[in-house]
């Protein structure tokens, strides 16, 4: 049976270090563990799922551009680019693909510079502070929104 939707997960800088980087803030779950769980969940939901992690802003932007026309929803943890990247915001707006912004930690309970996001006001929603579970909730929400809009 053909997959209903294509959902793209993008992870920004330093998320390749999950599990070992500041586990008190980000948890002990690795990015590979998160992606594996989402792949299993997506398969059960009959959804095509793809993933990219990059420490390079231009790679994330190029991937967003390439998603135009073949991706129904983007899940993105922009990491530090949340607070700095107008270019990432512009790329997401340019392709008109709905997206959910995800953060493992509660950015509002951290340093003041982390309180501002260049993406939040144009996102479908923002999930923060729920650890790795936030990714699962984002995938479930994306599928539900796509299912009810088609």
Curated annotation (Swiss-Prot):
Pathway where this protein functions: Metabolic intermediate biosynthesis; chorismate biosynthesis; chorismate from D-erythrose 4-phosphate and phosphoenolpyruvate: step 3/7
Residue spans crossing the bilayer: none
Catalytic activity: 3-dehydroquinate = 3-dehydroshikimate + H2O
Pfam families referenced in this protein's UniProt entry, alphabetically: DHquinase_II
GO biological process: amino acid biosynthetic process; aromatic amino acid family biosynthetic process; chorismate biosynthetic process; quinate catabolic process
The keyword Lyase belongs to this UniProt entry's keyword annotation: yes
Residues of the site described as Transition state stabilizer: 21
InterPro entries named among the record's database cross-references: DHquinase_II, DHquinase_II_CS, DHquinase_II_sf
Statement: the UniProt record of this protein carries the keyword Amino-acid biosynthesis: yes
Catalytic site: 26 (proton acceptor), 103 (proton donor)
Entry's EC annotation: 4.2.1.10
Keywords: Amino-acid biosynthesis, Aromatic amino acid biosynthesis, Lyase
GO molecular function: 3-dehydroquinate dehydratase activity
Binding site for substrate: 77, 83, 90, 104-105, 114
SUPFAM superfamilies: Type II 3-dehydroquinate dehydratase
Subunit architecture: Homododecamer.
Family to which this protein belongs: Belongs to the type-II 3-dehydroquinase family.
Function of the molecule: Catalyzes a trans-dehydration via an enolate intermediate.
Protein name: 3-dehydroquinate dehydratase
